[in-house]
Amino acid sequence: MTISKLVLASGSPRRRELLAQMGYQFEVVVPNVEEKRAAAESPAQYVERLSRDKALAGAALVAAEAVVIGSDTIVVKDQQVLEKPRDFADAKRMLLKLSGSQHQVMTGVSVTCRGITHSVVVTTEVWFKTLSEQEIEAYWQSGEPCDKAGSYGIQGLGGRFVTRIEGSYHAVVGLPLYETDQLLHKF
């Protein structure tokens, strides 16, 4: 099947940039999906469901023949999901938890068209240097952590906190290029 219309169901400018980097022409819709983890869901199940919910909600907003991509990214430390911070205190708590240690970034990607949905979860291991309270305060003041899972962006100022990664850099940013391309080739 040739993709006649591709839609990204995401308000994330980073996901738009990454999909464009892959050479795809696409439209953007921003579906309203509640991001609430069910008690029995593992972090991987949660992020996969969110990506699927976003793809399906996006599909409901566009023509039936459209191929729709939904994606979500979470940060996981000790099986605890760290999402976008509510305020400075929340961001500080998260960054102190990540400081000087290893965590996982999980990005779920789902692609749907005409009732068929394919999904993948990409997990990347990330290591942080030890952060001082002054670094955390200055980083918060930059405004960068406000809309990011785990309160940091690897592609921006937060990248200076990362000492090492194992896995997909692009998945940490918000859209794993290889895996997304593989899913799109199923349509």
UniProtKB/Swiss-Prot annotation:
InterPro entries: ITPase-like_fam, Maf-like. GO terms for biological process: nucleotide metabolic process. The record marks R14, T73, Q155 as: Important for substrate specificity. It comes from the Bacteria. PANTHER family: BIFUNCTIONAL DTTP/UTP PYROPHOSPHATASE/METHYLTRANSFERASE PROTEIN-RELATED, BIFUNCTIONAL DTTP_UTP PYROPHOSPHATASE_METHYLTRANSFERASE PROTEIN-RELATED. One of its GO terms (molecular function) is dTTP diphosphatase activity. This is dTTP/UTP pyrophosphatase. Keywords: Cytoplasm, Hydrolase, Nucleotide metabolism. Its cofactor is a divalent metal cation. HAMAP family: Maf. It is found in: Cytoplasm. Nucleoside triphosphate pyrophosphatase that hydrolyzes dTTP and UTP. May have a dual role in cell division arrest and in preventing the incorporation of modified nucleotides into cellular nucleic acids. Its EC number is 3.6.1.9. The active site is at D72 (proton acceptor). It holds the Pfam family Maf. Belongs to the Maf family. YhdE subfamily. It catalyses: dTTP + H2O = dTMP + diphosphate + H(+); UTP + H2O = UMP + diphosphate + H(+). One of its GO terms (cellular component) is cytoplasm.
